[in-house]
Regions:
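Conserved N-terminal catalytic core of the sugar/cofactor nucleotidyltransferase
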Residues: 1-83
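Catalytic cores of nucleotide-enabled group-transfer and carboxylate-activating enzymes in metabolic
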Residues: 7, 15, 30, 53-54, ...
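Short, high-confidence coil segments that cap the C-terminus of an alpha-helix
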Residues: 13, 60, 87-91, 176
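Conserved beta-strand segments of alpha/beta enzyme cores
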Residues: 15, 35, 114, 177-179, ...
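Structural beta-sheet core signal
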Residues: 18, 64-65, 91-94, 180
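Conserved core of the sugar-phosphate nucleotidyltransferase
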Residues: 25, 29, 73-158, 165
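Short glycine-enriched loop/turn motifs at secondary-structure junctions
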Residues: 66, 130-134, 181-184
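Left-handed beta-helix
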Residues: 156-320
Length: 320
């Protein structure tokens, strides 16, 4: 859930609680002491959120409920949902407008622009199926009201599960206002298989490339460049086609990474020239003006200002 939790953290909540299944020891270890709750039985989304009650405690702020398998959600969208509740809505729901809404639940509006109900596609009337606004599944609710409504929902449905979306009907019955915030369709894309994973990776890579170019980095064929999310590339750097910049890299101002180079854990000063066909492995440090040429591999090596390794070389555990 790293991408989702990173977005939540950037949105500024006081606490992030992850709801897990009982057989989630690996994820619990990965959380490294961060709060989590266990949903003992898989009894629906409402039951999953209710499982966090004891961990959340008496918090009287705003709860944002999101899915760990939607890595493309942004902090700005989560903030917009929280702001909607802070402005007076009892519940704020993320909505999106896909090119083809078939199969998605619809957010049925009322006359005042609020949400009257959520209806699944299979249960929708022909008129409701013409509604473009679909349920993104992410919502913000004031915490005390959230758990009060969850205590009132039932599992009287075909699946015998407790649905989080049932709190909308309860809120409206209590005379409360339910609003929506429109977000991009890609933000609610779930990752359920390897095909979804590839699509999500492509979308995230596009975001990383755009951010780098907006920061002053030149990419001559950006669709062929692959970046780690933690890579730092300073302005006026030039990245040629078919380059991989992996985890832990820092590329200095004005440096050039030429085609078919692969970097991981490397730190480059300003105006370095890397590649083509160079491989920089973890522990590589290059000061200003270093040249590492074609078919050169480095690991745990420091190259001082102006040093050159032009071609066909392995440098390991060295200082040049």
């Amino acid at each position: 859930p790293a991408w989702s939790s990173d977005a939540a953290e950037a949105a500024g909540p006081v606490s992030i609680v992850t709801v897990l299944s009982p057989d989630s020891e690996d994820i619990q270890t990965w959380l490294d002491g961060a709060p989590f709750a266990i949903q003992r039985d898989q009894n629906g989304t409402g039951d999953a959120v209710a499982a966090a009650r004891d961990v959340v405690g008496g918090d009287d702020g705003i709860a944002i409920i999101m899915f760990a398998d939607t890595p493309l959600v942004t902090a700005s969208s989560l903030t917009a949902l929280a702001d909607c509740v802070a402005a007076g809505a009892a519940i704020a729901i993320a909505g999106f407008e896909p090119a083809d809404p078939t199969g998605y639940g619809r957010l049925v509006p009322d006359e005042d622009g609020g949400i009257n109900r959520i209806v699944e596609h299979k249960d929708a009337t022909e008129k409701e199926r013409r509604i473009a606004l679909c349920n993104g599944g992410i919502m913000a609710v004031r915490t005390p009201a959230l758990f009060a409504w969850l205590s009132r929902i039932t599992n009287d449905n075909a699946k015998g599960e407790y649905y989080l979306t049932d709190i909308v009907e309860l809120a409206l019955a209590d005379g409360q206002q339910v609003r929506h915030v429109v977000i991009a369709e890609e933000e609610v894309m779930g990752v359920n298989d390897r095909l979804d994973l590839a699509r999500a990776e492509a979308a995230l890579q596009s975001r990383l490339r755009i951010a780098a170019m907006e920061g002053g980095v030149t990419m001559t064929a950006p669709e062929t460049v692959f970046l780690s999310a933690d890579a730092v590339i300073e302005r006026d750097a030039i990245i040629e086609p078919h380059v991989v910049i992996g985890a832990g890299c820092n590329i200095g101002e004005g440096s050039m990474i030429r085609s078919f180079s692969h970097l991981e854990g490397a730190r480059l000063g300003a105006c370095c020239m890397i590649g083509p066909y160079a491989r920089l492995r973890p522990g590589t440090e290059a000061d200003e003006g270093v040249k590492i040429g074609n078919f050169v591999e480095t690991k745990n090596t420091r190259l001082g200002a102006g040093a050159k390794a032009n071609h066909l070389t392995y440098l390991g555990d060295a200082e040049i």
